[in-house]
Amino acid sequence: MIALGSDHAGFSLKEEIKKHLDETGVEYVDVGCYSPERFDYAISDQKACDKVVSGECTAAILCCGTGVGISMAANKVKGIRACCCSDYFSAKYTRLHNDANALCMGERVIGAGLAIELVDVFLNTEFEGGRHQNRVDQIMAIEKGEKLY
């Protein structure tokens, strides 16, 4: 199950992603927003990320105008490793090497076609582990307030 969230500026992109997920049989829960009326991304962001952290969902897909604000908010939720992506390579390698569990995109930055490609590669790429696991462990240690130096 995937958690989807957006603000008003990412609403239309989220709706296009929902259509694609429906067509491909990927289950999701939409935590809002539910219209193009003004809505602050931190609310839907936190709802979606909480579902990932609790284990109810395996990943979050989050949309706002640029993807930046919603990714900043997502990374404040303990246990979330969010990445703002606008290209295929980053969307793939954020999963492959960084074990990201939230993909953030900007409706004002990329079109629906590219966004769907990024969603597909993000959801279908497994974490490689190995030498990258230590780096993910370091990220999580920083989140806990540990010093790496």
Question: Predicted segment positions?
Answer:
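Glycine-rich phosphate/diphosphate-binding loop of Rossmann-like nucleotide-binding domains
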Residues: 3-23
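C-terminal binding/interaction regions
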Residues: 3-5, 9-10, 88-149
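A short beta-strand-loop structural module common to alpha/beta enzyme folds
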Residues: 27-38
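Structural motif
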Residues: 37-46
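Helix-adjacent hinge/juxtasegments
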Residues: 47-84
